[in-house]
A protein has these predicted regions:
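Aromatic- and acidic-residue-enriched carbohydrate-binding clefts of CAZyme catalytic domains
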Residues: 261-286, 314-340, 372-399
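Active-site groove signature of glycoside hydrolases
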Residues: 251-261, 349-383
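An acidic-aromatic substrate-binding cleft motif
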Residues: 205-246, 250-254, 262-263
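N-terminal accessory beta-strand-rich subdomains and adjacent acidic, glycine-rich linkers
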Residues: 20-207, 211, 578-583, 588-591, ...
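Active-site-adjacent "subsite" loops/lids of carbohydrate-active enzymes
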Residues: 215, 222, 229, 233, ...
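Active-site-proximal substrate-binding groove within the catalytic cores of carbohydrate-active enzymes
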Residues: 176-180, 401-617, 623-625
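Glycine-rich, aromatic-flanked loop segments that form ligand/cofactor-binding clefts
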Residues: 196-211, 254-257, 282-333, 415-419, ...
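Hydrophobic faces of well-ordered beta-strands that scaffold small-molecule active sites
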Residues: 221-227, 255-257, 300-304, 365-367, ...
Length: 627
């Protein structure tokens, strides 16, 4: 490894000031890299901090490491790391933010705009940006080891030269005082495939931080039913038990009881949160209710909003002075976010979840809104000298809380299920749970597919779940199948009132649930490659040693049939009866409709063919003479 170190102090007189067009602080140091040119370190006010900068290589990737030290505890300075490389071959930029539309390569000049600025922190997205093109190569990929503190980052085009500018900016929001800090920024110029670039960046961050993924029980991959979209907050024990029996009859294995079990009404959405006890009029005996769902044949999980307490809860007076901030100024109706730096706050939350699993008998928890644990601009702890808190950093406290939750729940139930969802995703979150769900996008199969693919590339070995599926009750069977097919490469969650569902849709659900379970290993654990992120992933493939499953989501997508040594399934999710298939040899294709009925067989010649496959159905391919 080639190392270049610079120790800098505030005595630097010859600093270079950036222009307004560059939208960055003054350059205090530069360091040469092997493949990414000169990296710039920027900072407007170093204060008491000394900067040490080094560059090196890691498996052919350039890594710049910045360490800052102060002789006394102080607020860390705002600083940045910038790269400038050729823009050749870069047409799009991918980031993990599920609320951003498309894979835009924004101009550097637009950096200040909200939609062009990307942020990550412990429970918010992933510090990765990948520049790629329509051939699915990635000439530039950027990753940062900072997985806890807020980070602003991205890849941008220089309006004047079309060069790509990579930037990572640290401590743009206030943080707890410290004496030292270190981080690394990696730039990958190896021009690998898009999917590999995203996965490699994720692995690099995980390894750089020494993270260990949480154990993933096989049940985390089981299809499940959620009460959320079907019932919202209007849930009752008897009705949910009926739904559990319906779900089990269709092939679902787990149920999530979502919001509403703990409240009847409140002045605002969550102003009654915090006690986490069932409403007697809805769930008179939670333990007996859980047993009834188990009797139906399902595992059972419970939703909880981790950070919130409301002024209509019994614990409000106990914890109202141990919060990060309060929303609302009318009482009742105020909602507060707890401060996890207080040990008694963490203990209260952990004991709540222990009661859910240990006393009531739930098999797991859905832990919501942990992205709300954010230090406000003015840290309330500074006013009282951090009295009562056993750590100063909010991200550090959340990390400790989540690790302790998993440890103590696994002591009760070793195969406990713990679900999180976008946006609170990222390398650190992989340590705390074993299920990661797509962010809410009801009745939007395209968004569900895109977000599923993004999660599959960034979530390591944990089970990626779709957002809960809903569709119009008057859909055709083929139309009802499309939401399912769009997330076939994830663990599928359903959320419709099953007792009221269209009978034709029931057959669709039953068939595709059975299909997804027969091919579970290839779909959920195989070599997964989604294609053309710039177009929302128009076709997807995944395979294991025995079979290959490819799905087309656009009529003009060309699906590759792959090796003749595997059984090949081609899923038609285009909404038409045509799929373009590229086969290296002649094959026979056996056709099945959307409820699994065989409709015939045709011969496919080698090369590219327009193949007529039933709408929302599939073809099973085999070499001629072997079908």
């Amino acid at each position: 490894m080639r190392i270049c170190c610079l120790c800098l102090a505030a005595m630097f007189a010859g600093v270079v000031f950036a222009t307004d067009m560059d939208q960055k602080a003054k350059v205090i140091a530069t360091v040469q890299t092997v493949g990414a040119g000169v990296a710039e370190i920027t900072c407007d006010d170093m204060g008491s901090w000394k900067f040490s900068v080094s560059s090196g290589q890691d498996a052919g990737r350039d890594v710049v490491t910045v360490r800052i030290d102060s002789p006394v505890e102080a607020m860390p300075p705002k600083f940045g790391v910038f790269f400038r490389v050729s823009g050749a071959g870069v047409q799009n930029v991918w980031v993990s933010a599920s609320d951003r539309d498309g894979c835009h390569l924004w101009p550097q000049l637009w950096w200040g705009g909200r939609f062009a600025k990307y942020n990550s922190q412990l429970a918010r997205d992933t510090p990765i940006a990948v520049g790629f093109n329509s051939t699915e190569r990635a000439p530039v990929a950027l990753a940062c080891s900072e997985a806890f503190h807020p980070l602003t980052f991205g890849l941008y085009a220089d309006d004047r030269t079309c060069e790509i500018i990579g930037r990572c900016e640290f401590f743009q929001r206030s943080a707890a005082k410290m004496k030292s800090y270190a981080c690394s920024v990696m730039l990958d110029r190896r021009n690998g495939s898009f999917a590999d670039a995203v996965r490699d960046c994720t692995r690099w961050i995980v390894e750089r931080n020494g993270f260990t993924e949480a154990p993933v029980p096989e049940a985390a991959f089981d299809p499940l039913y959620s009460t959320w979209y079907a019932y919202l907050q209007d849930v009752r024990a008897e009705e949910i038990e009926d739904e559990a029996r319906e779900a089990a009859s269709l092939g679902m294995k787990t149920m999530i009881l979502d919001d509403g079990w703990q409240k009847v009404d409140s002045a605002s959405f969550y102003s009654a949160t915090g006690d986490w006890m069932p409403v007697q009029s809805r769930f008179p005996d939670m333990k007996t209710h859980v047993a009834a769902v188990h009797e139906a044949g399902l595992k059972y999980m419970l939703w909880l909003a981790v950070p919130y307490i409301g002024d209509e809860s019994k614990v409000w007076d106990r914890f109202k002075d141990k919060v990060l901030f309060i929303r609302g100024d009318k009482s009742p109706g105020r909602i507060a976010v707890l401060d996890p730096r207080f040990p008694e706050v963490r203990e209260y939350l952990i004991r709540t979840y222990e009661r859910v699993v240990g006393e009531w008998g739930f098999d797991g928890v859905k832990l919501d809104f942990i992205d709300e644990f954010v230090q406000p601009g003015d840290d309330p702890a500074a006013k009282d000298g951090f009295a009562g808190r056993d750590c100063r950093s909010v991200p550090e406290a959340v990390d400790r809380l989540m690790k302790d939750v998993l440890t103590r729940l696994r002591a009760i139930k070793p195969d406990v299920l713990v679900e999180f969802r976008q946006h609170y995703m990222g390398p650190a979150i992989l340590q705390y749970g074993n299920m990661m769900r797509v962010a809410d996008c009801p009745a939007d199969p395209c968004a569900n597919r895109k977000r599923m693919c993004d999660l599959r590339l960034t979530s390591g070995g944990i089970a990626v779940h779709s957002d809960m599926l809903v569709w119009s009750n008057d859909e055709s069977p083929e139309g009802a199948a499309l939401p399912i097919l769009n997330v076939l490469y994830s663990t599928i969650q359903y959320s419709m009132a099953l007792k009221k569902i269209n009978p034709a849709h029931r057959a669709v659900i039953r068939h595709w649930l059975a299909f997804s379970q027969r091919h579970r290993d290839a779909l959920l654990k195989g070599a997964f490659v989604p294609h053309h992120a710039e177009n929302g992933y128009t076709w997807i493939e995944s395979e294991n040693e025995g079979e290959r499953i490819a799905a087309a989501y656009a009529e003009n997508a060309c699906v590759k049939a792959g090796s003749p040594s595997r059984t090949v399934y081609v899923i038609n999710a285009t909404g038409t009866d045509v799929v373009i298939v590229d086969s290296t040899l002649p094959r026979m294709a056996e056709m099945f409709n959307t409820i699994g009925e065989r409709t015939g067989a045709v011969r496919i010649e080698s090369g590219v063919s327009r193949v007529h496959i039933p709408v929302s159905g599939y073809a099973k391919l085999a070499p001629v003479g072997k079908l």
